[in-house]
Regions:
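A short beta-strand motif characteristic of beta-propeller blades
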Residues: 40-45, 82-87, 131-134, 141-147, ...
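Structural motif
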Residues: 72, 114-119, 258-260
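Conserved beta-strand positions in repeat-built beta-propeller and related beta-rich domains
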Residues: 64-69, 106-115, 166-170, 207-212, ...
Length: 262
């Protein structure tokens, strides 16, 4: 059995090094991509969900993951945010939710014990209990790092076909994962430092960079940015992301807003 990684001073220093990494396209093709600034519609806030951190549309509603610990997932009516189901999960500081193989898949971005590596959870959508879990690859440190920082795991998750995409900011990558084994199928470079929500759009992958208040459309073959949506400073900050009928929706864990691009 593969030994799970431990948090250590070596890991902390590795995180410092990773934080300085600049994407390979930062001074090249990214400067040439099309930038749009659509209007943001602030739709609603969900009662009892104060820090919505990711979104997943399903045929009978919209799943919203609340970051307040321990995390609850709310299934709501997309048109008005009225609650259909409330699910208590075992996730801590969760930042990603998706649905596939009859289960919810949730990124437990932190753990109750900070020395424990963050994990990705397969969750029973009726009980909220964890069915399986795997150590999240690429977990570590990013952004403003101090000795008191704790490792950060996955942020956005999005099911595509028989696998799911996962954004892990500390790694500087987006991983395509085999769900039932937790193994990496492949990876592509992330479009920014604080990558978050993901959405699948007719063979292309949208990815949020929360720090830049931007959403990038990527070629999932190699991570090349094709389009950039730039939000304004007074718009809610993008965290979670999904797409419905060709329209991007996002949520902001800081303000609580569920938003849609117009």
């Amino acid at each position: 059995m593969q030994k799970e990684p431990e948090v250590s001073r070596r890991g902390f220093l590795a995180g410092l090094a990773a934080a300085a990494v600049i994407p390979r396209w930062a001074h090249g093709s990214r400067a040439d991509i099309v930038v749009t600034m659509p209007r943001v519609e602030k739709l609603y806030k969900i009662a009892g969900c104060t820090q919505p951190n990711d979104l997943q549309f399903v045929p009978d509603g919209l799943w919203v993951l609340d970051q307040v610990d321990p995390n609850k997932a709310f299934k709501v009516r997309p048109k008005d945010g009225s609650i259909l189901e409330t699910l208590q999960t075992e996730s801590i500081h969760g930042s990603g939710i998706t649905y596939g193989h009859g289960a919810l898949w949730i990124a437990s971005t932190k753990m109750t014990d900070p020395a424990t590596p963050p994990r990705t959870l397969k969750v029973d959508p009726k009980t909220g209990k964890t069915l399986k879990s795997w150590v999240t690859p690429g977990s570590g440190y990013y952004g403003a790092i101090t000795p008191k920082s704790t490792p950060s795991g996955a942020h956005g998750l999005k099911w595509v076909g028989e696998n799911y995409w996962m954004a892990v900011p500390a790694s500087g990558k987006l991983f395509l994962m085999a769900p039932e084994t937790g193994e990496i199928v492949r990876s592509i470079p992330a479009p920014g430092v604080r990558t978050h929500g993901l959405a699948w759009d007719n063979g292309l992958l949208w990815c949020v960079d929360s720090n830049e208040r931007a959403i990038f459309k990527l070629n999932p073959a190699d991570g090349t940015p094709l389009t950039k949506i730039q939000l304004k400073k007074d718009d809610p900050e993008p965290h979670g992301l999904d797409i419905d009928k060709g329209v991007l929706w996002y949520c902001d864990a800081a303000s609580g807003w569920i938003c849609r691009l117009a």
